[in-house]
């Protein structure tokens, strides 16, 4: 689609019009518009580094997972672009009801504000994963499989990590035993699928674990877990202050690890309607002071759940290789 044919402003207006409407209200978009978003944003991703070097102030958000109403709440809280600069840590699609609206608004903002709005790749921005967990079905139901493949081409070009003011390392999952130098990330060629093992896989899939020293097996059946010692060594070696990552549900929307050397952000409150978690967003000011803005879980959703708030649901989901698909 030629640049002139994609009216990003019109699309953003439509996507924001559902604010205040009943949650889940579908936004009408044409296939040509959505395809245009994928093609144009892909060009921008490829024109920018795979390892982004960003400057504060900015706001950092974790997983969204198709919870479009909550994404709009985040922007209401943090300021709609370009009022604030944003970095999202991946996992835009799957599981929630409105992956299409979610990813389309994010891509539209990327096109409109390419130097102020940044998106990293999560493990769900990968065909083999979002084929299973909802995005493929949503694309097929509302458009067609060809459009899902166009999204795959776009996702294969997303940046993988970011460093804020040379001090805060950001990625979706975590560290890798293969990561010795930042140059290794810069050398990853795009477009690329996410391999089953190795550096790119680990950056999108690994998890911190307080019970591990060094590297451990990951219950997900993919990548590794890493201990506080690994975090400290990594920060020292690269003269960094903090690792900021997403990838796991945390009760308060953010959770520290390794004496505040790592923080997990998760920005989808009431995740999947199954958890009573809050959603968190981290604001980094010009002095690199970090503060947290929290979207509380809504009581309303919780009361419809079997057993109510005291049913003893775990804070984080069991991390199996193939979690059951909720239907």
Curated annotation (Swiss-Prot):
EC number(s) given by UniProt: 3.1.3.16, 3.1.3.53
Keywords: Acetylation, Carbohydrate metabolism, Cell cycle, Cell division, Cytoplasm, Glycogen metabolism, Hydrolase, Manganese, Metal-binding, Nucleus, Phosphoprotein, Protein phosphatase
Localisation per UniProt entry: Cytoplasm; Nucleus
UniProt catalytic activity: O-phospho-L-seryl-[protein] + H2O = L-seryl-[protein] + phosphate; O-phospho-L-threonyl-[protein] + H2O = L-threonyl-[protein] + phosphate; O-phospho-L-seryl-[myosin light chain] + H2O = L-seryl-[myosin light chain] + phosphate; O-phospho-L-threonyl-[myosin light chain] + H2O = L-threonyl-[myosin light chain] + phosphate
Gene3D superfamilies: 3.60.21.10
Positions that bind Mn(2+) 1: 63, 65, 91
UniProt binding sites for Mn(2+) 2: 91, 123, 172, 247
Keyword Cell cycle: yes
Catalytic residue positions: 124
Cofactor note: Binds 2 manganese ions per subunit.
Annotated region described as Disordered, given as residue ranges: 305-327
Gene Ontology molecular functions: metal ion binding; myosin phosphatase activity; myosin-light-chain-phosphatase activity; protein serine/threonine phosphatase activity
SUPFAM superfamilies registered for this protein in UniProt: Metallo-dependent phosphatases (SSF56300)
GO BP annotations listed: cell division; circadian regulation of gene expression; glycogen metabolic process; regulation of cell adhesion; regulation of circadian rhythm
Activity control mechanisms: Inhibited by the toxins okadaic acid, tautomycin and microcystin Leu-Arg. The phosphatase activity of the PPP1R15A-PP1 complex toward EIF2S1 is specifically inhibited by Salubrinal, a drug that protects cells from endoplasmic reticulum stress.
InterPro entries registered for this protein in UniProt: Calcineurin-like_PHP_ApaH, Metallo-depent_PP-like, PP1_catalytic_subunit, Ser/Thr-sp_prot-phosphatase, STPPase_N
GO CC annotation: cytoplasm; nucleus; PTW/PP1 phosphatase complex
Expressed in which tissues: Detected in gizzard (at protein level).
Modified residues annotated as N-acetylalanine in this record: 2
Record's function text: Protein phosphatase that associates with over 200 regulatory proteins to form highly specific holoenzymes which dephosphorylate hundreds of biological targets. Protein phosphatase (PP1) is essential for cell division, it participates in the regulation of glycogen metabolism, muscle contractility and protein synthesis. Involved in regulation of ionic conductances and long-term synaptic plasticity.
Annotated family: Belongs to the PPP phosphatase family. PP-1 subfamily.
Protein name: Serine/threonine-protein phosphatase PP1-beta catalytic subunit
Organism: Gallus gallus
Lineage per the UniProt record: Eukaryota, Metazoa, Chordata, Craniata, Vertebrata
Gene name of the encoded protein: PPP1CB
